[in-house]
Amino acid sequence: MLSIMDMAGTYYLGLFCGYFSIKDVIRWVDDVIDKSESPISNDLIELSLSERQSTADVGSKLLRILQNEYTDRPMNIILGLCYKKLVLAPENDDVMLYLYRLSKQSSLPSDYINNSIISLSDEFYLATEGIYGDRKVVVSDMIGFLEPFEVYANGFLEEEAGSK
């Protein structure tokens, strides 16, 4: 079972990179509030009421929930979700944009992951612009790189399905 902190971290990163929308965040926090058997924090209530606020404001509220306690799990979940999306639609360039934005985030679990994402993003750009390389090969390489993170996405998706 994922903690609220892990879920908030996942939604923060997903919102930051464009994988999740504000509506996704609100849906999640409303579900947490509905199912909670203990008192609800003011931060969760404020987040629930943030539908008309900017992405930056919603992100700030998610960070308040995190209380500066970061783990690698949220990033691993987002990488796994990107894997699943890329496998389902390899022609969809959105995943590469998500990954590029994540590479700008300071909470990547390791330099290896950061360097791999940057390298594959650069290769993807060169291939799609017809400068160098084959787009299908780069997408295949990205799928191979992201595959180990699938298990994290599966846990997140099971948690999401169980909460509905």
Please state what every model-predicted region is.
Residues M1-K164:
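Acidic, Ser/Pro/Thr-rich low-complexity regulatory regions
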